[in-house]
């Protein structure tokens, strides 16, 4: 296949520097996937995925298999193992199966970290390279996690955590224990411990339970008479996840609570 026929082409090298992975597409969804053996002189570009009906990307090469994150036959995404000798979908084997919640994947410390979005909140599961579930990470609170990444030989990884009362803070993660420790945080003159966040569910008109995060100062009596800022968003398959805003914080002080 002539790669120049595609509108967008990108490439990356696996961490072990053995394979060049090439993604090609003509639109913003769905992609073709190819690879080239960098250890074999005059190696040809080989095909992994020969249609653009799904999104797929290689996250690693391990034990003569590509680990691929894909939404092929899995709307919420899964990880499959594809043998290098026969990497096309007919030979894919589920490595970490799809769940009811969407997933994003990070690597580091010779482990795989899968972030699931459950009711608009982050939960992170740790797996080994045999696909075995090890633990759910104990996060600093109800909020959003991003950027758990590192090299395979790293024993300490870093990630960012935030919610409506916690500005973006960097935590260090011990991959052997799954324990986190605050590394650094934004310098803002306020005390997060003065605020409370909790999740509730509101039944909409059609019976759907809609998750809501309520944030307010400690000590407020929740009697239904407090001024409240209510904000929501729904569209384009985008979920509104907790994030810190100094403007919302000041609004909370004035309005008593927001959700």
Describe each model-derived feature in a short phrase:
Residues 1-226, 236-249:
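Peripheral, non-catalytic segments that deliver or gate enzyme domains
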Residues 250-259:
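Single conserved hydrophobic/aromatic residue that forms the stacking wall/gate
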């Amino acid at each position: 296949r002539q790669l120049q026929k595609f509108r967008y082409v990108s490439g990356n090298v696996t961490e072990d520097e053995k394979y060049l992975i090439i993604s090609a597409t003509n639109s913003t969804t769905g992609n073709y996937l190819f690879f080239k053996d960098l250890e074999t002189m005059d190696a040809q570009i080989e095909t992994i995925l020969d249609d653009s009906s799904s999104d797929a990307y290689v996250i690693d090469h391990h034990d003569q298999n590509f680990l691929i994150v894909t939404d092929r036959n899995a709307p919420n995404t899964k990880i499959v193992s594809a043998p290098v000798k026969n990497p096309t979908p007919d030979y894919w084997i589920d490595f970490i199966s799809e769940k009811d919640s969407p997933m994003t994947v990070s690597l580091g410390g010779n482990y795989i970290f899968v972030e699931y979005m459950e009711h608009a909140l982050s939960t992170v599961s740790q797996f080994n390279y045999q696909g075995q579930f090890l633990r759910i990470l104990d996060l600093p609170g109800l909020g959003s996690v991003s950027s758990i990444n590192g090299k395979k030989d790293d024993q300490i990884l870093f990630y960012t955590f935030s919610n409506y009362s916690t500005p973006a803070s960097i935590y260090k993660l011990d991959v052997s224990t799954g324990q986190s420790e605050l590394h650094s945080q934004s310098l803002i003159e306020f005390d997060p411990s003065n605020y409370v966040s909790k999740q509730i569910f509101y039944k909409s008109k059609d019976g759907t339970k809609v998750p809501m995060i309520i944030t307010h100062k400690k000590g407020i009596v929740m009697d239904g008479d407090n001024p409240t800022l209510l904000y929501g968003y729904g569209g384009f398959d985008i979920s509104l996840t907790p994030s810190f805003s100094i403007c919302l914080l000041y609004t909370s002080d004035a309005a008593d609570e927001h959700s």
